Amino acid sequence: MDPMELNNVSIEPDGDSCSGDSIQDSYTGMENSDKDAMNSQFANEDAESQKFLTNGFLGKKKLADYADEHHPGMTSFGMSSFNLSNAIMGSGILGLSYAMANTGIILFIIMLLTVAILSLYSVHLLLKTAKEGGSLIYEKLGEKAFGWPGKIGAFISITMQNIGAMSSYLFIIKYELPEVIRAFMGLEENTGEWYLNGNYLVLFVSVGIILPLSLLKNLGYLGYTSGFSLSCMVFFVSVVIYKKFQIPCPLPALDHNNGNLTFNNTLPIHMISLPNDSESSGVNFMMDYAHHNPAGLDEKQVAGPLHSNGVEYEAQGAEKCQPKYFVFNSRTAYAIPILAFAFVCHPEVLPIYSELKDRSRRKMQTVSNISISGMLVMYLLAALFGYLSFYGDVEDELLHAYSKVYTFDTALLMVRLAVLVAVTLTVPIVLFPIRTSVITLLFPRKPFSWLKHFGIAAIIIALNNILVILVPTIKYIFGFIGASSATMLIFILPAAFYLKLVKKEPLRSPQKIGALVFLVTGIIFMMGSMALIILDWIYNPPNPNHH
């Protein structure tokens, strides 16, 4: 018997697709369950495989205790909501302001609400399919629906999503660790030293911290890291809201061509500190002055609107500081993939469901409603206030945008440190299921081997580092993974599994028609987004010096 598989699930009619009937009421033959569990081929699997099968939410309990799906869940409603919220929240929140800048406020809100609602509907389909299909494992549902191709499709989608998450975390290390070091050393700008090079730093962190943690057989700190990561993101959103009211618009002395602060190597650099309500920090802009002229401006240009503090604002500043409500450009194509990437939690829904106390589909759907709604509010706040801080100059990784405004700021430094610690500790957690899936696929029924354990981890980390070093910006990770694997996990696979496995509803029923429309919508989203992103790569090639 496969673990977490519902061998004896009845398929009695269930008129309410979110029925409150507990899934465990459907079991028969419970007297043989302990014997079946002990005879399971998975009973002797290594601890890492046990953790993967439940995605880390079952702690240190033996797999045999969970081999049958009739076991009662022990996780409270509140903790299940917290676990799912943490599964949703990730690095995608850092790219939402960029998405808003390239869609406009109103269009972004419409898209955000749409993706959130579709994610909830996807969870509904997944929970219904899990009961009818008799399994709480995503890959197993794929195998039951479409055989080996379905299993491989689910495996590839989940693995790609995890690799994308790993890469985005390493990108954050690449972006933010140099800024933290620069702040601690009191440097006003990146001097180009090796210890300020993000490519070197991400390699050092990967080899010195991430790889050793990935070699552990169990990740006992998982629970602590989950809570810490979510707390970091709440702190991040709070600081983004607070800083919006400190950053002036337009930003002083911006170069008219590229929107960056102008530096002139032939002129001395002076620091302008604008008034700030914070007692511990100021908003610092690096300015060049020659005879009190702003950087890069000649005598004729100085005739422009120069303020008494020597800071010149752009002539078109008022227009640049007006929020846009509808925007369409080549980068708008990244919006839906970024949102899809931010809302993916579906591989974690089933393990959390399996551990929910007094579980039922209705109760798990309520958990999903609360978690996704809470993340929706956080995403909207982060995107809106991040966008209103920088408008069109916002970057694809929001934290990095503050680097051109602040040379040093205590609150931002704390956010950067917290986020860096969180993502560094999260990378090994994401790596574990990737490695276990690869081992299960390539070396089925083989005993645990430290050589495979180490070698596969090293290869995965090496490939992700190469990806992070070669790919110029995190938006390509958000865009490609969001358009491919995230769309598969949210739209295509749940709908396809539902159409194939739920037999009691006729093909022309409203439920099946809705699932079919959902499937077609997902395919259109994936193909359209991928096509637009590829066109953007062709006609707007990335700047190799980006970041």
Curated annotation (Swiss-Prot):
Region feature Disordered, mapped onto this chain: 1-34
Residue numbers marked as site, Influences on amino acid transport capacity: 232
pH-dependence annotation: Optimum pH is 7.5-8.5.
Membrane-spanning segments: 105-125, 152-172, 196-216, 221-241, 333-353, 370-390, 412-432, 454-474, 477-497, 515-535
Tissue specificity of this protein: Detected in liver, in hepatocytes surrounding the central vein. Not detected in heart, kidney, brain, lung, small intestine, spleen and thymus. Highly expressed in placenta.
Note: Imprinted gene expressed from the paternal allele in blastocysts.
Record's protein name: Sodium-coupled neutral amino acid transporter 4
Organism, as annotated: Mus musculus
Protein's gene: Slc38a4
